[in-house]
Amino acid sequence: MFYTRSSLRVCSFKGFLLCSAVFVGGLNATPAMSADVAEDEIIVTGARPIAESEAAALQIQKNADSLVTVAAADSVGRLPDQNIAQAAGRLPGVAVERDQGQARYISLRGAPNYWTTLSFDGINVVSPEGRDARFDSIPSAIASQIIVSKAVTPDMPGETVSGNVNVITRSAFDYSGLHFDAKAGTGVAELGDRKQYEGSVVVSDRFKAGEGEIGILVSGSFYERGMITDNFEIDYERVSQDQRPGSASRFWAQETENKLYRLTRRNWSASGRLDWKPDSTNTISLRSVYTIFKDDEARDNFRFDLDDRQNDLAANTAACTIAANTTPTNTGYADVCIGNTQFQGTVYGIDIRQRSTLRAFRQSIFTNTLTGDHEFSEGWKLTWLGNFTESKDDRSSVGEASWDSPSTRTLRPTVSYDFTDPNVGALRLFNTVQLSSPTRYQAGAAVTAIDTFTKPLSSLTILDAVDTTKAYTGKLVLARETEFLGGEATFRAGFQFDQRTKTVDESEIRLTTAAQFTTAGIPTDYNQFSLDQSFLGKIPMGYTFRYFDTDKMEQVSATARKNFTFVPNTGNIFDVREQVYAGFLMGNAKFDWGSAVGGVRVEHVKNRGVAVGTVAGVSGPVTAESSQTLVFPSMHVNYNVDDTKKLRLSFNSGAARADYDQLRPNVTVNDSNQSISGGNPAVKPERAYGVDAYFEWYMKPQGYLMAGVFAKKVKDVLYRETRTFGSDALNSNNVDRSAYAFSGITNGGDGRIYGFEAAAQLQLEPWTASLGL
């Protein structure tokens, strides 16, 4: 079992708006002067875009038939944040997980992030990474509203367990005529003095087309953010050789590392929408959204392999007298007898594993939808749509050079560690001195510059890796409006088909010999591959270092590509296809006392995975197939206590399926992280059944109070097991992978999640007005 403690220092920004311009034709025409107004009198009219957007969001939330929370763009179409994760993170019950300080994943009410689905205009979109929907690749500039549904209804896919984030794209019909909106801004990151830039533009117009009307909207956005980040990470483990009294509760740091980043992140988006309303009862819409997230990252990684020689410690269950010993016969790792503890101690002559990595990471989503809404006869409505989405996750690495300590103990560092402060991974480095009669080790002179230690080049890896997911969706919904039990009701019957295919293509050039290094033009001495650049971060590390030269890495990579051939990583290549046939029945009834929504969704899921596997020493294609039928009932009741207060009760269900890479019938090897991950095509989805009880009070002039409780019972919880691989079956190219960390997905029994949520949004004006402000 492995545990990780980490700390990350991120950028803070000082930003300012350069310009923001809006032109709205036909919206703000100057009113004609009335006869009783003097010609020299000036009339001033005002608008409050932010207040208007908040009011619109609260109105949508109040009128919703299930539990939702909404972020709406202001009257000129702006959300206050750069990406969807940041914008949604302002809403109650929405937490964001960050990478390098930037909001990336969304968790609803404390649930796992893969329980949250992403959709554009109601169509679920597969993230480039898979079921863990990433929201940092989606600029908020494309959205007019963000609707977060916390209670699942039958028209939502069954994989929506904790909720859905629905990005409502802009339409020309959001505006009364010609509309132009542009924004530009810049700022500076204080850590590392890095610049950031932002800009967006939206143009739309409406045109008469016979008896109907056509609306056209196009938009684009760009965001760039330079960053310097620094961190430390500590991975803990149980050590089998530590058998002394109290060992059951002791977890030792197997390694500690610093990751020091220089990076630039960019977002682009382009969207277009064509809406045609031939008459008041028919609408046909073509929508397209293309987003790109690019991360150019240079990472200097120093990993101190504290458990490098843990087998030197003899397992002994007897109690010992604890006494400081600065000349042990072993490394001192996990040895309580010499005075070492989990959080303080000294380890003698251990390995430094240094990585210099230059990445050109890129993710994109290209989603296209053709949809139509048609009202016919009396009370009948037909909605149809077709969607194609292609998501790409380009994980390629320009180059990664590995520099490792030699096997000679006296050429390796002695490391003194102090982890008592959880915010600092304090280290001190020393030379290692070997004593004789018997052989013992002690700390020599203190070392500040880590690059004075011998760390010859051990490998150079160039990776080309692209994961492509192609998804097709077809949906047909027939609705009937009618009277029901004294109220107005809408009954819906729908069918939906989804097919998603994820294909992984991965190959690499891996150089490990001196002759290959010479051909590629990379020096074996790190100091000849580094810059004379002082540390740009601020985290205290206990040593100094030199950044690697990114220009030299690009040159070496280009030379290696010309002289060596990429070899497919067959163990990491797979093709997984998922088909979902779904049907649902639901009813929505509105009464004087409130409303009710209920129904059932049935899904038949078919999975097929193809990969290269090794069976009895023979490698070849392996195909695994599975199928299952799942039923998802739900019921939501909304009671109007009065015109301003609502009580919401709901029961809902869902099923979180394992991610596509977890369903593959093979294993994936990552030499950089020394990890192996395996697929499990037979793993079952985790089923969730939940209840919610919420009270909402909408207050004047504008605001609301909300409090509620929620609970979910989960069956067949998806559990990621982690252990030491313990086999030489995957050893190759003189690389021993038996000690790598192996992880795989499995079902781990039942569980539950429950909690309490409260939120308040109030206007300060009634109080500030009384103060004369």
Task: Outline where the language-model segments fall.
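Surface-exposed extracellular loop regions of Gram-negative outer-membrane beta-barrel proteins
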Residues: 177, 244-247, 256, 265-289, ...
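Gram-negative outer-membrane beta-barrel transporters
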Residues: 711-713, 731-773
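Structural signature of Gram-negative outer-membrane beta-barrels, strongest in the C-terminal barrel
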Residues: 277-279, 289, 389, 467-475, ...
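Flexible glycine-rich, low-complexity coil/linker segments exposed to the extracellular/periplasmic environment
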Residues: 316-350, 411-459, 505-572, 726-746
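Transmembrane beta-barrel wall of Gram-negative outer-membrane proteins
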Residues: 192-346, 353, 361-371, 633-636, ...
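A beta-strand signature from Gram-negative outer-membrane beta-barrel systems
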Residues: 91-92, 125, 138-183, 229
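Extracytoplasmic beta-strand/coil segments of soluble accessory domains associated
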Residues: 85-124
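N-terminal periplasmic "start-of-domain" segments of outer-membrane beta-barrel proteins
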Residues: 43-77, 105, 113, 123
